Amino acid sequence: MAINVIINGINGKIGRVVKENITAQSDLELVSGTGRQDDLAKTIQTTHADVVIDFTTPQSVFHNAEIIIQSGARPVIGTTGLTLEQIALLDKQCRNKKLGAIVAPNFSVGAVLMMKYAKEAAHYFPDVEIIEMHHSQKIDAPSGTAIKTAQMIGEMRSSKKDEPFKDRARGEIKNGIPIHSIRLPGLFSHQSVIFGSNGETLTIRHDGMDRNCTMPGIFMACRKVMELDYLVYGLENLL
């Protein structure tokens, strides 16, 4: 039986790409698409949606996720902006409802592997900085992927305070790691994690060329979320 899917944010840039690609997935049925003016809860109920893919805005994503869970569907969220406290609250709601949810700062499998390898490298290289580069329309900085990468690396290191540099050009500190953000036309989605040690450096880099790079991860999440009864944060936890 096919999984009934709603795309929330269907008129957005990535929502349109998901719509174009989902028809090729024989086990996923697009039953509706919603936007800012639509009643999401009512749409979930009338379409009997199993999964809602959310690519909306940082301002609305937490409210959207609560609506999805309370309406009995499973959120697959690619919208950035959720805090760790909000993610914990959503996980509690999922467990109460026995519903799965997936929140991923990046649905690109390549980007997730980059984060995974960076975490492994942190065993051997204590000094690291992150450079993330995106198109000029990207709203948030640092990116959700960069913040998640810093969190994963931070798990392998002794605790470091997020004390800001006196010189702001040295970047914003997350989990004790400097992050540098670049926003320019001509870029899409790029991140380098640069480790340094005596006499050597190690760079782990991912380049996303367009939004199609996220499609395999999004559709994998739609399938995996049906097997869960709690929230999973990060696509790396599904690989």
Curated annotation (Swiss-Prot):
Subcellular localization: Cytoplasm
EC category: oxidoreductase
Gene Ontology biological process: diaminopimelate biosynthetic process; lysine biosynthetic process via diaminopimelate
Active-site annotation: H134 (proton donor/acceptor), K138 (proton donor)
Catalysed conversion reaction: (S)-2,3,4,5-tetrahydrodipicolinate + NAD(+) + H2O = (2S,4S)-4-hydroxy-2,3,4,5-tetrahydrodipicolinate + NADH + H(+); (S)-2,3,4,5-tetrahydrodipicolinate + NADP(+) + H2O = (2S,4S)-4-hydroxy-2,3,4,5-tetrahydrodipicolinate + NADPH + H(+)
GO CC annotations, alphabetized: cytosol
Keywords: Amino-acid biosynthesis, Cytoplasm, Diaminopimelate biosynthesis, Lysine biosynthesis, NAD, NADP, Oxidoreductase
HAMAP family per record: DapB
UniProt name for this protein: 4-hydroxy-tetrahydrodipicolinate reductase
Lineage of producing organism: Bacteria, Pseudomonadati, Pseudomonadota, Gammaproteobacteria, Legionellales
